[in-house]
């Protein structure tokens, strides 16, 4: 029987792995992969871009670089990425299967929960968190966290916290926040037990020794991730540390750390998803008291993650209010606090909670209604309800929220069936489900014809939960399949296919026609230069050093190279590199090339209307005549000879 269960678990993990491939597949390199993979290769081979300022900066994910980078001794970069993706997605599949089975021990249901989880985290995150993606430190941390939580909800605390310690070693924030949320869940459980004990209820848990052993062992293991992170500010003055924190939070990573800077749709969709999770918190699964206790521990874990996010919201919104009220003199302290990614935990726990809760509720409602999900009564009873849920989704999206947004934005109303999932579609669906769910819960409480109302409410709840558990994930998987079957451009390249091809052409030219020691300046947001051209670059917006001193120097360099010094605020970063070069003029650019030892500059071709601006056209022609060595339809390469600049 044990072997049978293991084979079933392996088959479920294989199916989840297929879903992970569907959501995670993108051409190499994906977002952040040049960053993490480059660091990992450089860890074992210091000669790999030895002159690159980012790769030679301090390492914050030491264990990940040490373990993953070891395979770079045998594999080329592209093969290394595919090996890493396959390993991470496979480990994640097994980890999720363990967590799902710990809460919902039904054959095959971990596949349904995985499909729902991948869908909800893809479309309803607040601050950009993901679980299935490219090769980086948090990707390998999540499987250990999931596995640890599977043990945690079963009260096997020694193994749980050891696994969470391993997760922390690979990524201190992913694992560390998980440990704190687990401890918060235990604290809530202890408070509940104390209240029940005082009322003559249950005794103490008797798991203290096991818990301490797990925390001690996991804490020691986590030092592999914690100590490098703590060392990042070492040697920097308090002023430099604070400046680095401000740069990191408000200038570079605000889209992950500062919700007030995000589009309002991000906040609305996450709020709606949180309300859906609260809706499923009322659900009590069938089974033993032990099974219900596991769900309580999981729900408390999610609740603590939301409390953590609430603290982050206070640092973001509350501190400015305190300053305005005169209760706080320095509002910049928020940067020192927000840098700890307060929304990273809830960004995945709430989607996971909805995925697990909706699937469990749908299964229980099916049993209570007298039909099995895979039984004979499924097709005549459950499928029409799911179809109705899909119709509600389309109607709500078309007639209500999408129309309101179109009016507000003075845009055309989107079509009935969108070509790809969009935040508006997802928000509309959740809003519709919430409205119907609240209505049917209210109907259930009305006295009178109890049997008819009970049948109606059960059918409606089955429709709501089935739509959440099956219709939405299936829709997302279908749209993802359609998108991935088309022409894909690496997300680290320029987004448009023609521009991406031009980018690859200029990268190939650089690799074939410049020395390996050459240093380039390239457009600010193009992160795949080193990957394709195999040449170093002086700076990159994506590749922000992690130690405080290097971060401050990096930011000053970015300001000097990528802004004109005229514009202020965030808009100063909006100009393409060619516009910055034309604003500075050839002599100033040459001086900067000499100062920073830049051999080549890769810039976008100027816009077609440059001919209507004589002075700008004159500057461009002068620059091209003196420095151009290559160009294609989209990019131009300028070469600077440093020896000719002495004395300027």
Predicted features and spans:
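Transmembrane catalytic cores of multi-pass membrane glycosyltransferases
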Residues: 20-37, 44-45, 49, 53-61, ...
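Short hydrophobic/aromatic helix or loop-helix immediately within or flanking a transmembrane segment
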Residues: 37-39, 54-77, 167
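Loop-to-helix entry region of an early transmembrane alpha helix in multi-pass inner-membrane enzymes
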Residues: 52, 74-94
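Transmembrane-helix signature of polytopic, membrane-embedded enzymes
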Residues: 96-124
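Membrane-interface transmembrane helices that cradle and orient dolichyl/undecaprenyl
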Residues: 140-159, 186, 192-196
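Membrane-interface alpha helices of multi-pass inner-membrane proteins
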Residues: 149-151, 158-175, 183, 216-220, ...
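Transmembrane helical bundles and short interhelical boundary loops of multi-pass, membrane-embedded
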Residues: 304, 308, 312-342, 349-352, ...
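Short periplasmic/luminal acceptor-recognition loop of GT-C membrane glycosyltransferases, typified by
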Residues: 470-486, 496-579, 586, 590-610
